[in-house]
Design a protein with these regions (language model features):
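Amphipathic alpha-helical interaction surfaces in cytosolic regulatory modules
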Residues: 38-114
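Short acidic-hydrophobic, aromatic-tinged amphipathic segments that line or gate anion-handling sites
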Residues: 116-120
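Short beta-strand/loop segment at the start of cytosolic alpha/beta domains
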Residues: 2-33
């Protein structure tokens, strides 16, 4: 059973009842799990998470979206800005577990060419 190395840190940040951000660390990968709605009222919270991770020299980030119900253009903008910042430091952001609706937003907006997207967390972790 390989559970001991999976969870070394777990932080929760709840923004009302619209979005919850859960942070974990698996080996050298920061996992940012987003639950709920990522929109103009919650996007700055996710932006703060990325800023903090960058300041800690955390260059590998997996954004787990299996419980992300909705993403607006403000949420897409935060992800795009984070991708640009990570590219500057030779870091990488990957996404995993997009629902069909969220994946469709990524496809329509062209974001599937910006981010590596995996069906599951485990697939993404193996790709780092």
């Amino acid at each position: 059973m390989k559970t001991s190395h999976y969870l070394t840190q777990r932080n929760k940040k709840q923004t009302g009842c619209k979005m919850e951000i859960i942070q974990e660390k698996v080996n050298d990968v920061a996992i940012v799990e987003i639950k709920g709605r990522l929109d103009v009222t919650t996007a700055s919270d996710l932006e703060q998470v990325f800023t903090k991770l960058l300041s800690e020299n955390q260059n590998k980030v997996l954004v787990e979206c299996r419980e992300l119900e909705y993403i607006s253009s403000a949420g897409l903008r935060v992800l795009l800005n984070a991708a640009k910042q990570y590219n500057k430091v030779s870091g990488q952001i990957m996404l995993a577990g997009l629902s069909q609706n969220v994946k469709q937003v990524f496809e329509i907006s062209g974001f599937t060419s910006i981010f590596p997207i995996y069906a599951t967390r485990d697939e993404a972790l193996k790709a780092f």
